[in-house]
């Protein structure tokens, strides 16, 4: 329950630039005066994911406008919804601020996945803020040399071990997670249904008109024209892509996130919603399927890292969704584990080249694979042990996926960032 409440929460805007906006808002609040100098360091993963994505309330893209919005009108007490209350006037002021004020945002020399440091200087004061391990986790606050908060994690030189050290996922099995969910009182997880409403509303926005690159809208039109069938897989693709189209375009609406990511939330929730629309279940069963999805997503992220070179929607959140769907299908233990391993065998190589409009394509593929993996597992069709990176147990398969995603693709992540930098010429 503690993990669900900590990792499933509303967010407005792509989580990486929102995290920078949150840090900037906090630093400005600490400073308490006009800013004359700024310096921002972000981990390469934050830098990559914030480079090309739309920001709610403005047509501009990227980290600089997110930082400006946080400085001008952000309220840190709103957490990952820090940009939700900005007025049109504040957005215009932030855009002018960005145009007329040098904003220093550079990649930090760190292997941590989630690291943000903001230093703001005024005429009389200086404020420093750090966020580490999680997008809304303030670990260090300082004003004029006085340390107000020091909760810095110990992070190894090679990975984000601080985040992993917090997790209980190393000691439980997938079946233990599922059994725990089955025993939870419905009232304790009823809040998960709020995510259904939020994420469906974002999907509806992206399906009403061509938003972003219009992946969801294109699937919807193709279903209406008879080019695609109105089956559960295409419906899941349409819903999930439509929501991502809108979110990546910067539509100012909240979504329910999962494990620090709004797109993870879309992928962990909407394929299950699509299955539930076609094959209705009780609210209690739907909530428990969502709980399984979020927890399996977190289980996988424990090994792959919160941010990595692989698409977390493709390898983690969609795998959580397939587990939830398989459970809704009354799958046996073997079938649920088989659905998970089908996903690992399918989408494990999908790269993450930052948050952007094209994410809708990846979420569409992830939603399709999630439904497909659960459907064929229900027919006892799954990848056998010791086949590729699929191990002798589902837990070993997930650990193998983590090794490939974290250690195996660290150089890939560097190259992706270099390629994006060369094209975008971001300072």
Swiss-Prot record:
GO terms for molecular function: L-cysteine desulfhydrase activity. Signal peptide: none annotated. It comes from Clostridioides difficile (strain 630) (Peptoclostridium difficile). Disulfide bonds: none annotated. It holds the Pfam family SDH_alpha. GO terms for biological process: L-cysteine catabolic process to pyruvate. This is UPF0597 protein CD630_32320. Belongs to the UPF0597 family.
């Amino acid at each position: 329950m503690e993990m669900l409440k900590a990792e499933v929460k509303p967010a407005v805007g792509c989580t990486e630039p929102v995290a920078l906006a949150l840090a900037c808002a906090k630093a400005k609040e600490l400073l308490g005066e006009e800013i004359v100098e700024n310096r921002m360091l972000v981990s390469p993963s934050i830098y990559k994911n914030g480079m090309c994505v739309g920001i709610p309330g403005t047509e501009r893209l990227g980290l600089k406008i997110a930082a400006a919005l946080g400085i001008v009108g952000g309220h840190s007490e709103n957490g990952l919804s820090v940009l939700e209350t900005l007025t049109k006037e504040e957005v215009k002021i932030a855009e002018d601020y960005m145009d007329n004020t040098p904003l220093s945002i550079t990649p930090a020399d760190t292997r941590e996945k989630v690291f943000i440091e903001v230093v703001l200087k005024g005429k009389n004061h200086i404020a420093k803020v750090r966020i580490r391990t999680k997008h809304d986790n303030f670990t260090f606050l300082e004003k004029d040399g006085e340390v107000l908060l020091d909760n810095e994690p110990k992070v190894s030189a090679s990975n984000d071990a601080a985040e992993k050290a917090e997790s209980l996922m190393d000691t439980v099995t997938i079946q233990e997670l599922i059994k725990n969910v089955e025993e939870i009182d419905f009232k304790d997880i009823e809040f998960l249904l709020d995510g259904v409403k939020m994420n469906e509303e974002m999907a509806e926005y992206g399906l009403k008109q061509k938003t972003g690159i219009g992946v969801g809208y294109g699937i919807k039109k193709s279903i209406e024209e008879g080019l695609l069938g109105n089956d559960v897989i295409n419906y899941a693709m349409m819903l999930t892509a439509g929501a991502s189209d809108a979110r990546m375009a910067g539509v100012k609406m909240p979504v329910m996130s999962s494990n620090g990511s709004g797109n993870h939330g879309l992928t962990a929730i909407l394929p299950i919603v699509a299955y539930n629309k076609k094959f209705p279940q009780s609210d209690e069963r739907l909530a428990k399927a969502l709980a399984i999805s979020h927890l399996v997503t977190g289980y996988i992220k424990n090994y792959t890292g919160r941010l990595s070179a692989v698409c977390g929607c493709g390898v983690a959140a969609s795998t959580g969704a397939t587990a939830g769907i398989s459970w809704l299908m009354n799958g046996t233990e073997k079938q649920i584990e088989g659905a998970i391993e089908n996903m690992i065998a399918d989408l494990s190589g999908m790269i993450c080249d930052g948050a952007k409009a094209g994410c809708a394509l990846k979420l569409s593929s992830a939603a399709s694979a999630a439904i497909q993996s659960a459907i064929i597992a229900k027919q006892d069709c799954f990848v056998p042990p010791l086949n590729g990176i699929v191990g002798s147990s589902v837990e070993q398969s997930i650990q193998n996926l983590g090794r490939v995603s974290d250690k195996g693709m660290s150089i890939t992540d560097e190259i992706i960032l270099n390629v994006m930098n060369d094209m975008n010429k971001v300072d």
